[in-house]
Amino acid sequence: MPELPEVEVTRQGITPYLVDQTVVDLIVRNPSLRWPVPELAKQIIGQTIRQVRRRAKYLLIDTDAGTSIVHLGMSGSLRILPHDTPVEKHDHIDLVLANGRILRFNDPRRFGAWLWCQLPEEAHPLLEKLGPEPLTDAFNVNQLAASLAGKKKAIKLCLMDNHIVVGVGNIYANEALFAAGIHPEAEAGKIDIERLTVLVAEVKQILAHAIKQGGTTLKDFTNADGKPGYFAQKLHVYGRGGETCTQCGNLLSEIRLGQRTTVFCSICQPR
């Protein structure tokens, strides 16, 4: 599943091709995504795209009339292509631009979404209760400590809770907890401020580095130019259950936590 770095890399890739461009057509081949695609054509055709933003794992394509909210789901991607590029299987939506290019939404598993809202989009039900962005000052040790106070849930589940902090999915939660030396099943409310300080710093560093590397490519993600990300080459624990720890040589443990695969080192991340 594309996580925050992959969505941010996509945003950076498509923005130069979209901003200040007029939408001349919208082609919806399959409206049956995670939620039905609304009747977008009458709202967006003729509109000029003002900016492309990201909130959590949502891409926000702004026009004067409103905002398209795009979510890549489990396997979705957005590509900038020439307008005459042949349509392939799972190419569900084309946003056709006056510059002769299209923004094409491909989603094999159809868990993605393309929605529309009038401004202010912050009041949209998908966005209004989201926590702080991890790469901003709003995500800090004081905020995290307050959010975790009294919680008995495993820290990994809290780290992946979008009400606490957005965009930290399974890949980066595994990696950040390993880097901070925190066991993924540790009771969130009992982690001391010193370790939370380290965890906040590691979340920020790992996400920023993943963005710089173009995201993590496992089996689904490519960026807006169709190129893979390279952060997968630097993963220390995610997807490496049963292999040796890069720090101590111990065999990495793999468990299921919150229905997600969780990998950790029992030596470097003591309970």
UniProtKB/Swiss-Prot annotation:
GO terms for molecular function: 8-oxo-7,8-dihydroguanine DNA N-glycosylase activity; class I DNA-(apurinic or apyrimidinic site) endonuclease activity; damaged DNA binding; DNA-(apurinic or apyrimidinic site) endonuclease activity; zinc ion binding. Its cofactor is Zn(2+). Its EC number is 3.2.2.23, 4.2.99.18. It comes from the Bacteria. Keywords: DNA damage, DNA repair, DNA-binding, Glycosidase, Hydrolase, Lyase, Metal-binding, Multifunctional enzyme, Zinc, Zinc-finger. GO terms for biological process: base-excision repair. The keyword Lyase applies. DNA binds at residues 90, 109, 151. A zinc finger (FPG-type) spans 236-270. PROSITE patterns: FPG_CAT, ZF_FPG_1, ZF_FPG_2. SUPFAM superfamilies: Glucocorticoid receptor-like (DNA-binding domain), N-terminal domain of MutM-like DNA repair proteins, S13-like H2TH domain. InterPro entries: DNA_glyclase/AP_lyase_DNA-bd, DNA_glyclase_Znf_dom_DNA_BS, Formamido-pyr_DNA_Glyclase, FPG_cat, MutM-like_N-ter, Ribosomal_uS13-like_H2TH, Znf_DNA_glyclase/AP_lyase, Znf_FPG/IleRS. Binds 1 zinc ion per subunit. It catalyses: Hydrolysis of DNA containing ring-opened 7-methylguanine residues, releasing 2,6-diamino-4-hydroxy-5-(N-methyl)formamidopyrimidine; 2'-deoxyribonucleotide-(2'-deoxyribose 5'-phosphate)-2'-deoxyribonucleotide-DNA = a 3'-end 2'-deoxyribonucleotide-(2,3-dehydro-2,3-deoxyribose 5'-phosphate)-DNA + a 5'-end 5'-phospho-2'-deoxyribonucleoside-DNA + H(+). The active site is at residues 2-3, 57, 260. Belongs to the FPG family. Monomer. Involved in base excision repair of DNA damaged by oxidation or by mutagenic agents. Acts as a DNA glycosylase that recognizes and removes damaged bases. Has a preference for oxidized purines, such as 7,8-dihydro-8-oxoguanine (8-oxoG). Has AP (apurinic/apyrimidinic) lyase activity and introduces nicks in the DNA strand. Cleaves the DNA backbone by beta-delta elimination to generate a single-strand break at the site of the removed base with both 3'- and 5'-phosphates. This is Formamidopyrimidine-DNA glycosylase. It comes from Shewanella oneidensis (strain ATCC 700550 / JCM 31522 / CIP 106686 / LMG 19005 / NCIMB 14063 / MR-1). The lineage of its organism: Bacteria, Pseudomonadati, Pseudomonadota, Gammaproteobacteria, Alteromonadales.
